[in-house]
């Protein structure tokens, strides 16, 4: 995991921005986020390519910080007052429960179990006095839809605009799911794919499935 540093007394000075630059009010002050630095050359490359404004394909073994860095950089940019991005969408396939529609509850109830790792990541990104303060902050992020979680089973009819999309565990996506995600991308969007073929939960991996992933790596 990348290293994080405490911020000093430096404040970004939101009040000094002109109203012309402040496109909208963000629900959380980005100054609450800790300063996280890359620990490896590959992590540094991830930071650099992201800052260059590119769509990314983060491919690597477990524990290399793919999803953490993607979520950190995305949240930091979304909470910046002058960027066009308003939301972070975390999209993944719930392979073991791909028939998730048969489970009781709404989409939030069905996907809540899979949100726990991301909540833990977000906790590491903010400097809060105690757990209660973090719960309030995280609740605000969710309530304002600054961060949203989607299963590929519920993307139909959705258009994602002004957002940063993180497609996590993408090695578990079939061709139909990949197509569903890409065709839902709207205006002012950035997309990051994170995955590792060695961690695939698919029962069978077809030649077509592998070719789709290889093609995607060259497209982003």
Give the ranges of each region predicted by the language model.
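Conserved RecA-like ASCE ATPase "motif II neighborhood" in helicase/translocase motors
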Residues: 145-164, 174-178
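Interdomain "pre-motor" coupling segment immediately N-terminal to P-loop NTPase/helicase cores
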Residues: 1-23
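Walker A/P-loop NTP-binding motif
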Residues: 71-80
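Hydrophobic anchor at the beta1->P-loop junction of P-loop NTPases
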Residues: 58
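Inter-Walker segment of RecA-like/P-loop motor cores
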Residues: 105-154
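Conserved small/polar residues in nucleotide/adenosyl-binding loops
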Residues: 208-215
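Conserved lysine of the Walker
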Residues: 66-67
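Pre-Walker A adenine-sensing motif
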Residues: 40-51
């Amino acid at each position: 995991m990348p290293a994080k540093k405490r911020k000093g007394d430096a404040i970004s000075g939101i009040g000094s921005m002109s109203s012309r630059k402040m496109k909208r009010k963000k629900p959380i002050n980005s100054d609450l986020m800790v300063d996280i630095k890359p620990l490896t050359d590959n992590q540094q490359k991830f930071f650099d390519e992201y800052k260059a404004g590119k769509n990314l394909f983060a491919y690597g073994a477990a524990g290399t910080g793919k999803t953490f860095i993607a979520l950190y950089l995305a949240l930091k940019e979304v909470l910046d007052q002058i960027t066009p991005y308003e939301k972070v969408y975390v999209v993944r396939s719930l392979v073991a429960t791909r028939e998730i529609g048969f489970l009781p509850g709404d989409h939030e109830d069905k996907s809540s179990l899979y949100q726990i790792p991301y909540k833990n990541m977000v906790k590491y990104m903010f400097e809060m006095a105690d757990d209660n303060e973090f719960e309030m902050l995280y609740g605000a992020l969710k309530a304002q839809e600054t961060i949203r979680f989607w299963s590929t089973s519920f993307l139909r009819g959705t258009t994602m605009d002004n957002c940063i999309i993180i497609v996590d565990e993408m090695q578990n996506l079939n061709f139909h799911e990949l197509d569903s995600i890409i065709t839902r991308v709207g205006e002012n969007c950035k997309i990051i794919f994170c995955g590792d073929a060695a961690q695939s939960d698919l029962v069978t991996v077809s030649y077509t499935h592998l070719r789709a992933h290889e093609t995607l790596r060259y497209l982003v």
